[in-house]
Amino acid sequence: MSERKQILNCIDDPQQALIMLKRISARTSLEVQENAISSVQNILTEVKQLGDEALFRLTEKFDGFIPKPLEITPEQTLEAWEKTPTPLQEALQLAKNRIEAFHKYQIPKDFLKEGIHGELLGKNWSPVEKAGIYIPGGRAAYPSTVLMNAVPALVAGVNEIIMVSPAGPNGQLNRTVLAAAYIAGIKKIFRIGGAQAIGALSYGTQTIPRVDVISGPGNLYVTLAKKLVYGQVGIDSLAGPSEVLIIADHSADVEQVATDLLAQAEHDPLAASILLTTESNLAKKINLEIENQLKDHPRSAICRKSLKDWGLIVICKDIKSCAALSNSFAPEHLELLIEKPFEFISQIKNAGAIFLGEWSPEATGDYLAGPNHTLPTSGTARFSSALSVETFMKSTSIINFNQAALNKTSAAIMELANSEGLHSHSRSIEIRRSKPSSDD
Protein backbone atom coordinates (compact mmCIF):
# COMPACT_ATOMS: atom_id res chain seq x y z
CA MET A 1 0.00 0.00 0.00
CA SER A 2 1.42 3.38 -0.95
CA GLU A 3 2.14 6.01 1.65
CA ARG A 4 -0.47 8.19 -0.04
CA LYS A 5 -3.20 5.65 0.77
CA GLN A 6 -2.15 5.31 4.43
CA ILE A 7 -3.96 8.48 5.34
CA LEU A 8 -4.75 7.14 8.82
CA ASN A 9 -1.85 6.08 11.01
CA CYS A 10 -2.32 2.44 12.05
CA ILE A 11 -0.71 0.91 15.17
CA ASP A 12 -1.09 -2.23 17.25
CA ASP A 13 0.94 -1.42 20.38
CA PRO A 14 -1.46 -0.68 23.29
CA GLN A 15 1.04 1.52 25.14
CA GLN A 16 1.77 3.56 22.05
CA ALA A 17 -1.99 3.81 21.49
CA LEU A 18 -2.49 5.29 24.96
CA ILE A 19 0.22 7.88 24.32
CA MET A 20 -1.26 8.88 20.97
CA LEU A 21 -4.81 9.05 22.32
CA LYS A 22 -3.60 11.30 25.13
CA ARG A 23 -1.93 13.56 22.56
CA ILE A 24 -5.14 13.74 20.51
CA SER A 25 -7.22 14.54 23.58
CA ALA A 26 -4.88 17.44 24.45
CA ARG A 27 -4.80 18.90 20.94
CA THR A 28 -6.08 22.28 22.15
CA SER A 29 -3.05 22.82 24.32
CA LEU A 30 -2.73 25.06 27.37
CA GLU A 31 0.00 26.98 25.56
CA VAL A 32 -2.39 27.95 22.78
CA GLN A 33 -4.99 29.00 25.34
CA GLU A 34 -2.49 31.12 27.27
CA ASN A 35 -1.55 32.97 24.10
CA ALA A 36 -5.20 33.90 23.49
CA ILE A 37 -6.46 34.47 27.01
CA SER A 38 -5.11 38.01 27.44
CA SER A 39 -6.81 39.06 24.20
CA VAL A 40 -10.08 37.56 25.39
CA GLN A 41 -9.79 39.30 28.75
CA ASN A 42 -9.25 42.64 27.00
CA ILE A 43 -12.34 42.06 24.85
CA LEU A 44 -14.48 41.23 27.88
CA THR A 45 -13.26 44.29 29.77
CA GLU A 46 -14.04 46.55 26.83
CA VAL A 47 -17.56 45.14 26.48
CA LYS A 48 -18.18 45.48 30.21
CA GLN A 49 -17.08 49.12 30.18
CA LEU A 50 -18.44 50.35 26.85
CA GLY A 51 -21.39 48.07 26.04
CA ASP A 52 -22.82 48.44 22.52
CA GLU A 53 -20.02 50.79 21.46
CA ALA A 54 -17.50 48.00 22.10
CA LEU A 55 -19.62 45.53 20.14
CA PHE A 56 -19.69 47.84 17.11
CA ARG A 57 -15.94 48.46 17.23
CA LEU A 58 -14.94 44.84 17.79
CA THR A 59 -17.28 43.47 15.13
CA GLU A 60 -15.92 45.95 12.61
CA LYS A 61 -12.38 44.92 13.58
CA PHE A 62 -12.91 41.15 13.40
CA ASP A 63 -15.79 40.75 10.93
CA GLY A 64 -15.46 43.80 8.71
CA PHE A 65 -18.81 45.49 9.29
CA ILE A 66 -20.64 47.51 11.94
CA PRO A 67 -23.68 45.56 13.19
CA LYS A 68 -26.19 48.42 13.29
CA PRO A 69 -28.82 47.54 14.24
CA LEU A 70 -27.68 44.70 16.47
CA GLU A 71 -31.07 43.02 16.75
CA ILE A 72 -32.84 40.90 14.16
CA THR A 73 -36.51 41.87 13.94
CA PRO A 74 -39.38 39.36 14.29
CA GLU A 75 -40.34 40.23 10.70
CA GLN A 76 -36.90 39.16 9.47
CA THR A 77 -37.16 35.88 11.36
CA LEU A 78 -40.62 35.17 9.95
CA GLU A 79 -39.43 36.03 6.45
CA ALA A 80 -36.53 33.58 6.82
CA TRP A 81 -38.97 30.83 7.80
CA GLU A 82 -41.35 31.59 4.93
CA LYS A 83 -38.50 31.52 2.40
CA THR A 84 -37.21 28.18 3.68
CA PRO A 85 -38.03 25.33 1.27
CA THR A 86 -40.86 23.10 2.47
CA PRO A 87 -38.74 19.91 2.83
CA LEU A 88 -36.28 21.79 5.05
CA GLN A 89 -39.14 23.31 7.06
CA GLU A 90 -40.50 19.81 7.64
CA ALA A 91 -37.07 18.49 8.63
CA LEU A 92 -36.58 21.33 11.13
CA GLN A 93 -40.04 20.77 12.59
CA LEU A 94 -39.45 17.02 12.91
CA ALA A 95 -36.10 17.62 14.62
CA LYS A 96 -37.66 20.16 16.99
CA ASN A 97 -40.50 17.78 17.89
CA ARG A 98 -38.16 14.85 18.57
CA ILE A 99 -35.70 16.91 20.62
CA GLU A 100 -38.57 18.34 22.65
CA ALA A 101 -40.14 14.93 23.27
CA PHE A 102 -36.84 13.46 24.50
CA HIS A 103 -35.96 16.39 26.74
CA LYS A 104 -39.37 16.32 28.43
CA TYR A 105 -38.27 13.04 30.02
CA GLN A 106 -35.44 14.96 31.69
CA ILE A 107 -37.61 17.40 33.66
CA PRO A 108 -36.58 16.87 37.30
CA LYS A 109 -39.28 16.38 39.90
CA ASP A 110 -39.66 18.29 43.14
CA PHE A 111 -39.88 16.14 46.25
CA LEU A 112 -40.67 16.54 49.94
CA LYS A 113 -40.01 13.60 52.26
CA GLU A 114 -40.61 13.09 55.96
CA GLY A 115 -37.54 12.27 58.06
CA ILE A 116 -37.39 9.86 61.01
CA HIS A 117 -38.32 12.56 63.54
CA GLY A 118 -41.11 14.10 61.48
CA GLU A 119 -38.97 16.76 59.83
CA LEU A 120 -39.69 17.59 56.17
CA LEU A 121 -36.79 17.56 53.70
CA GLY A 122 -36.96 18.16 50.00
CA LYS A 123 -35.82 19.82 46.83
CA ASN A 124 -37.55 22.28 44.50
CA TRP A 125 -36.48 22.88 40.90
CA SER A 126 -36.94 26.15 39.02
CA PRO A 127 -35.74 27.51 35.66
CA VAL A 128 -33.35 30.40 35.28
CA GLU A 129 -35.01 33.65 34.19
CA LYS A 130 -32.88 34.33 31.09
CA ALA A 131 -30.71 32.03 28.97
CA GLY A 132 -28.24 33.05 26.29
CA ILE A 133 -27.44 30.67 23.46
CA TYR A 134 -24.40 31.09 21.24
CA ILE A 135 -24.74 29.73 17.70
CA PRO A 136 -21.57 29.50 15.59
CA GLY A 137 -21.96 31.34 12.30
CA GLY A 138 -20.02 33.42 9.85
CA ARG A 139 -19.45 31.25 6.78
CA ALA A 140 -21.09 28.18 8.36
CA ALA A 141 -24.69 27.48 9.34
CA TYR A 142 -25.83 25.28 12.22
CA PRO A 143 -29.63 25.28 12.55
CA SER A 144 -29.41 22.02 14.48
CA THR A 145 -27.39 23.79 17.17
CA VAL A 146 -30.17 26.37 17.53
CA LEU A 147 -32.66 23.59 18.30
CA MET A 148 -30.31 21.60 20.53
CA ASN A 149 -29.72 24.65 22.74
CA ALA A 150 -33.08 26.42 22.62
CA VAL A 151 -35.42 23.45 23.03
CA PRO A 152 -34.01 22.23 26.40
CA ALA A 153 -34.27 25.81 27.69
CA LEU A 154 -37.89 25.98 26.54
CA VAL A 155 -38.69 22.63 28.15
CA ALA A 156 -37.04 23.84 31.37
CA GLY A 157 -39.43 26.79 31.41
CA VAL A 158 -36.92 29.59 30.82
CA ASN A 159 -38.84 32.85 30.47
CA GLU A 160 -36.56 34.53 27.91
CA ILE A 161 -34.01 33.10 25.47
CA ILE A 162 -31.50 35.45 23.87
CA MET A 163 -29.64 34.15 20.82
CA VAL A 164 -26.35 35.54 19.51
CA SER A 165 -24.63 34.48 16.31
CA PRO A 166 -21.94 36.04 14.11
CA ALA A 167 -23.13 37.28 10.73
CA GLY A 168 -21.72 36.16 7.41
CA PRO A 169 -19.59 38.26 5.03
CA ASN A 170 -22.71 40.16 3.93
CA GLY A 171 -23.54 41.17 7.49
CA GLN A 172 -26.59 38.91 7.58
CA LEU A 173 -27.43 35.80 9.59
CA ASN A 174 -27.98 32.56 7.74
CA ARG A 175 -31.61 32.09 6.70
CA THR A 176 -31.83 28.50 7.93
CA VAL A 177 -30.44 29.48 11.33
CA LEU A 178 -33.14 32.14 11.57
CA ALA A 179 -35.76 29.62 10.46
CA ALA A 180 -34.70 27.29 13.27
CA ALA A 181 -34.89 30.19 15.72
CA TYR A 182 -38.40 30.94 14.47
CA ILE A 183 -39.79 27.47 15.16
CA ALA A 184 -37.95 27.41 18.50
CA GLY A 185 -39.84 30.57 19.46
CA ILE A 186 -36.75 32.72 20.10
CA LYS A 187 -37.79 36.37 20.25
CA LYS A 188 -34.45 38.14 20.79
CA ILE A 189 -31.69 37.51 18.25
CA PHE A 190 -28.50 39.55 17.85
CA ARG A 191 -25.98 39.38 15.00
CA ILE A 192 -22.88 39.39 17.14
CA GLY A 193 -20.29 36.68 17.73
CA GLY A 194 -16.93 35.90 19.28
CA ALA A 195 -15.76 36.65 22.81
CA GLN A 196 -17.56 40.00 22.62
CA ALA A 197 -20.93 38.21 22.32
CA ILE A 198 -20.18 36.18 25.45
CA GLY A 199 -19.26 39.39 27.24
CA ALA A 200 -22.52 41.04 26.16
CA LEU A 201 -24.58 38.13 27.49
CA SER A 202 -22.61 38.05 30.74
CA TYR A 203 -22.62 41.75 31.61
CA GLY A 204 -25.47 43.11 29.52
CA THR A 205 -25.24 46.15 27.24
CA GLN A 206 -27.58 48.98 26.30
CA THR A 207 -29.27 46.58 23.84
CA ILE A 208 -28.47 43.01 24.88
CA PRO A 209 -29.90 41.73 28.18
CA ARG A 210 -27.71 40.12 30.80
CA VAL A 211 -28.50 36.40 31.14
CA ASP A 212 -28.17 33.78 33.87
CA VAL A 213 -26.80 30.87 31.81
CA ILE A 214 -24.89 30.72 28.52
CA SER A 215 -24.84 27.61 26.33
CA GLY A 216 -23.57 26.78 22.88
CA PRO A 217 -20.24 25.94 21.23
CA GLY A 218 -17.76 28.27 19.59
CA ASN A 219 -14.13 28.73 18.65
CA LEU A 220 -11.23 29.03 21.08
CA TYR A 221 -12.01 32.68 21.84
CA VAL A 222 -15.65 31.90 22.62
CA THR A 223 -14.65 28.98 24.83
CA LEU A 224 -12.08 31.04 26.74
CA ALA A 225 -14.60 33.83 27.19
CA LYS A 226 -17.09 31.37 28.69
CA LYS A 227 -14.36 30.12 30.99
CA LEU A 228 -13.54 33.64 32.17
CA VAL A 229 -17.13 34.74 32.81
CA TYR A 230 -18.11 31.56 34.65
CA GLY A 231 -19.16 32.60 38.12
CA GLN A 232 -20.66 35.79 36.74
CA VAL A 233 -23.05 33.54 34.81
CA GLY A 234 -23.56 29.80 34.52
CA ILE A 235 -22.28 27.96 31.45
CA ASP A 236 -23.03 24.60 29.87
CA SER A 237 -19.47 23.40 29.22
CA LEU A 238 -16.14 24.30 27.65
CA ALA A 239 -16.42 22.64 24.25
CA GLY A 240 -13.34 21.68 22.29
CA PRO A 241 -12.98 20.31 18.75
CA SER A 242 -15.33 17.46 17.89
CA GLU A 243 -14.34 13.78 17.94
CA VAL A 244 -15.62 10.32 17.13
CA LEU A 245 -14.29 6.96 18.24
CA ILE A 246 -15.56 3.87 16.43
CA ILE A 247 -15.21 0.34 17.78
CA ALA A 248 -15.60 -2.15 14.93
CA ASP A 249 -15.36 -5.92 14.65
CA HIS A 250 -15.61 -8.43 11.79
CA SER A 251 -19.28 -7.56 11.22
CA ALA A 252 -18.61 -3.89 10.39
CA ASP A 253 -19.24 -2.55 6.89
CA VAL A 254 -16.10 -0.95 5.43
CA GLU A 255 -17.94 1.81 3.58
CA GLN A 256 -19.98 2.72 6.66
CA VAL A 257 -16.94 2.91 8.94
CA ALA A 258 -14.97 5.02 6.45
CA THR A 259 -17.90 7.37 5.87
CA ASP A 260 -18.51 7.82 9.59
CA LEU A 261 -14.84 8.68 10.15
CA LEU A 262 -15.00 11.22 7.32
CA ALA A 263 -18.24 12.64 8.73
CA GLN A 264 -16.20 13.71 11.74
CA ALA A 265 -13.11 14.81 9.83
CA GLU A 266 -15.08 17.15 7.54
CA HIS A 267 -16.08 19.33 10.52
CA ASP A 268 -12.75 20.92 11.24
CA PRO A 269 -8.98 20.43 10.78
CA LEU A 270 -8.86 19.80 14.55
CA ALA A 271 -11.59 17.13 14.53
CA ALA A 272 -10.44 13.68 15.69
CA SER A 273 -11.49 10.44 13.96
CA ILE A 274 -10.40 7.23 15.69
CA LEU A 275 -11.03 3.58 14.89
CA LEU A 276 -10.41 0.74 17.34
CA THR A 277 -10.77 -2.67 15.76
CA THR A 278 -9.88 -6.30 16.28
CA GLU A 279 -9.53 -6.83 12.52
CA SER A 280 -6.24 -5.90 10.84
CA ASN A 281 -7.74 -6.50 7.39
CA LEU A 282 -10.53 -4.03 8.17
CA ALA A 283 -7.98 -1.38 9.03
CA LYS A 284 -6.29 -1.75 5.63
CA LYS A 285 -9.61 -1.62 3.79
CA ILE A 286 -10.67 1.50 5.69
CA ASN A 287 -7.65 3.46 4.52
CA LEU A 288 -8.34 2.46 0.92
CA GLU A 289 -12.03 3.34 1.20
CA ILE A 290 -11.29 6.73 2.73
CA GLU A 291 -8.94 7.56 -0.13
CA ASN A 292 -11.60 6.49 -2.60
CA GLN A 293 -14.26 8.71 -0.99
CA LEU A 294 -11.91 11.69 -0.77
CA LYS A 295 -11.44 11.79 -4.55
CA ASP A 296 -14.62 13.81 -5.00
CA HIS A 297 -15.27 14.99 -1.44
CA PRO A 298 -16.19 18.72 -1.34
CA ARG A 299 -14.20 19.20 1.89
CA SER A 300 -11.30 16.96 0.94
CA ALA A 301 -8.57 19.34 2.13
CA ILE A 302 -10.13 19.71 5.59
CA CYS A 303 -10.62 15.95 5.87
CA ARG A 304 -7.04 15.18 4.88
CA LYS A 305 -5.64 17.68 7.39
CA SER A 306 -7.85 16.35 10.17
CA LEU A 307 -7.14 12.67 9.48
CA LYS A 308 -3.40 13.22 9.03
CA ASP A 309 -3.00 15.20 12.25
CA TRP A 310 -5.64 13.70 14.55
CA GLY A 311 -6.81 10.45 12.96
CA LEU A 312 -5.78 7.01 14.22
CA ILE A 313 -6.48 3.31 13.76
CA VAL A 314 -5.57 0.94 16.59
CA ILE A 315 -5.56 -2.84 16.13
CA CYS A 316 -6.62 -4.37 19.46
CA LYS A 317 -6.25 -7.97 20.60
CA ASP A 318 -9.92 -8.21 21.60
CA ILE A 319 -13.07 -6.17 22.17
CA LYS A 320 -12.30 -5.72 25.88
CA SER A 321 -9.06 -3.99 24.93
CA CYS A 322 -11.06 -1.70 22.66
CA ALA A 323 -13.30 -0.80 25.60
CA ALA A 324 -10.33 -0.04 27.84
CA LEU A 325 -8.75 2.30 25.28
CA SER A 326 -12.08 3.98 24.60
CA ASN A 327 -12.68 4.59 28.31
CA SER A 328 -9.22 6.15 28.64
CA PHE A 329 -10.00 8.54 25.78
CA ALA A 330 -13.60 9.28 26.91
CA PRO A 331 -14.86 10.20 23.43
CA GLU A 332 -17.52 12.76 22.65
CA HIS A 333 -19.17 10.34 20.20
CA LEU A 334 -18.73 6.57 20.44
CA GLU A 335 -20.01 4.30 17.67
CA LEU A 336 -20.29 0.56 18.34
CA LEU A 337 -20.20 -1.12 14.93
CA ILE A 338 -20.01 -4.59 16.39
CA GLU A 339 -22.11 -7.74 16.27
CA LYS A 340 -23.84 -7.41 19.66
CA PRO A 341 -23.57 -3.75 20.72
CA PHE A 342 -26.10 -3.90 23.57
CA GLU A 343 -24.07 -6.60 25.31
CA PHE A 344 -21.07 -4.27 25.18
CA ILE A 345 -22.63 -1.17 26.80
CA SER A 346 -21.80 -2.26 30.35
CA GLN A 347 -18.09 -2.08 29.48
CA ILE A 348 -18.33 1.59 28.46
CA LYS A 349 -17.78 3.97 31.37
CA ASN A 350 -16.82 7.22 29.65
CA ALA A 351 -18.56 8.62 26.56
CA GLY A 352 -20.67 11.64 25.70
CA ALA A 353 -23.07 9.62 23.55
CA ILE A 354 -23.09 6.00 22.38
CA PHE A 355 -24.41 5.03 18.94
CA LEU A 356 -25.30 1.35 18.73
CA GLY A 357 -25.18 -0.66 15.52
CA GLU A 358 -25.00 0.11 11.83
CA TRP A 359 -28.34 1.95 11.71
CA SER A 360 -27.28 4.58 14.26
CA PRO A 361 -24.52 6.69 12.69
CA GLU A 362 -23.49 9.81 14.57
CA ALA A 363 -25.51 11.96 12.17
CA THR A 364 -28.74 10.61 13.70
CA GLY A 365 -27.78 12.17 17.02
CA ASP A 366 -26.36 15.31 15.44
CA TYR A 367 -29.72 16.23 13.96
CA LEU A 368 -32.91 14.64 15.22
CA ALA A 369 -32.66 11.45 17.25
CA GLY A 370 -33.64 13.48 20.32
CA PRO A 371 -30.74 13.35 22.80
CA ASN A 372 -28.65 16.50 22.82
CA HIS A 373 -25.71 16.85 20.47
CA THR A 374 -23.86 19.29 22.75
CA LEU A 375 -21.53 16.77 24.37
CA PRO A 376 -18.36 16.75 26.50
CA THR A 377 -15.13 16.78 24.47
CA SER A 378 -11.38 16.42 25.07
CA GLY A 379 -11.74 13.66 27.67
CA THR A 380 -14.22 15.56 29.82
CA ALA A 381 -16.80 12.77 29.42
CA ARG A 382 -14.94 11.25 32.38
CA PHE A 383 -16.80 13.67 34.64
CA SER A 384 -19.39 15.63 32.64
CA SER A 385 -22.53 15.08 30.60
CA ALA A 386 -24.49 16.35 27.63
CA LEU A 387 -26.37 19.62 27.70
CA SER A 388 -29.78 18.96 29.21
CA VAL A 389 -32.89 20.53 30.70
CA GLU A 390 -31.03 20.78 34.02
CA THR A 391 -28.46 23.08 32.37
CA PHE A 392 -31.16 25.76 32.49
CA MET A 393 -32.51 24.95 35.95
CA LYS A 394 -31.36 25.15 39.53
CA SER A 395 -32.48 23.30 42.63
CA THR A 396 -33.30 24.68 46.06
CA SER A 397 -33.15 22.54 49.20
CA ILE A 398 -36.19 22.60 51.50
CA ILE A 399 -35.71 22.01 55.26
CA ASN A 400 -38.54 22.11 57.81
CA PHE A 401 -37.69 20.79 61.29
CA ASN A 402 -40.35 20.57 63.96
CA GLN A 403 -39.49 21.03 67.63
CA ALA A 404 -39.18 17.30 68.28
CA ALA A 405 -36.80 16.83 65.35
CA LEU A 406 -34.61 19.70 66.52
CA ASN A 407 -34.49 18.40 70.09
CA LYS A 408 -33.63 14.87 68.94
CA THR A 409 -30.70 16.08 66.81
CA SER A 410 -29.57 19.14 68.79
CA ALA A 411 -26.73 17.47 70.69
CA ALA A 412 -25.08 16.25 67.49
CA ILE A 413 -25.52 19.61 65.73
CA MET A 414 -24.00 21.49 68.68
CA GLU A 415 -21.12 19.02 68.88
CA LEU A 416 -20.30 19.59 65.22
CA ALA A 417 -20.65 23.38 65.48
CA ASN A 418 -18.39 23.53 68.53
CA SER A 419 -15.79 21.36 66.78
CA GLU A 420 -15.59 24.06 64.11
CA GLY A 421 -15.40 26.86 66.66
CA LEU A 422 -18.67 28.42 65.54
CA HIS A 423 -20.25 29.64 68.78
CA SER A 424 -23.39 31.24 67.38
CA HIS A 425 -24.16 28.18 65.28
CA SER A 426 -24.21 26.13 68.47
CA ARG A 427 -26.14 28.77 70.39
CA SER A 428 -28.82 28.99 67.68
CA ILE A 429 -29.64 25.36 68.51
CA GLU A 430 -29.29 25.70 72.28
CA ILE A 431 -31.75 28.58 72.65
CA ARG A 432 -34.35 26.63 70.75
CA ARG A 433 -34.00 23.30 72.51
CA SER A 434 -34.37 25.01 75.90
CA LYS A 435 -37.72 26.43 74.83
CA PRO A 436 -40.72 24.70 76.44
CA SER A 437 -42.34 22.10 74.24
CA SER A 438 -45.56 23.11 72.56
CA ASP A 439 -47.01 19.90 74.03
CA ASP A 440 -46.26 20.99 77.59
Swiss-Prot record:
- The residues that the entry says bind NAD(+) are Y134, Q196, N219
Task: Give GO cellular component annotations, separated by semicolons.
Answer: cytosol
Q: Family assignment?
A: Belongs to the histidinol dehydrogenase family.
Which function does this protein serve?
Catalyzes the sequential NAD-dependent oxidations of L-histidinol to L-histidinaldehyde and then to L-histidine.
Q: Which GO terms describe its molecular function?
A: histidinol dehydrogenase activity; NAD binding; zinc ion binding
Q: Where does substrate bind?
A: S242, Q264, H267, H333, D366, E420, H425
The catalysed reaction is: L-histidinol + 2 NAD(+) + H2O = L-histidine + 2 NADH + 3 H(+)
Write out the catalytic residues in the record.
E332, H333
**HAMAP family per the UniProt record, alphabetical:** HisD
Query: Which cofactor does the UniProt annotation name?
Result: Zn(2+)
The region annotated as signal peptide is none
- Origin superkingdom: Bacteria
Enzyme class, spelled out? oxidoreductase
Biological process (GO) annotations? L-histidine biosynthetic process
Q: Which keywords does this chain's UniProt record carry?
A: Amino-acid biosynthesis, Histidine biosynthesis, Metal-binding, NAD, Oxidoreductase, Zinc
Listed EC numbers: 1.1.1.23
Recorded hits in InterPro entries, A to Z, give:
Ald_DH/histidinol_DH, Histidinol_DH_CS, Histidinol_DH_monofunct, Hstdl_DH
Quote the Pfam families the UniProt record gives.
Histidinol_dh
Binding residues for Zn(2+), per the UniProt record? Answer: Q264, H267, D366, H425
Q: How is the cofactor bound?
A: Binds 1 zinc ion per subunit.
Q: In which pathway does it act?
A: Amino-acid biosynthesis; L-histidine biosynthesis; L-histidine from 5-phospho-alpha-D-ribose 1-diphosphate: step 9/9
Q: Which Gene3D superfamilies match?
A: 1.20.5.1300, Nitrogenase molybdenum iron protein domain (3.40.50.1980)
The entry's protein name is Histidinol dehydrogenase
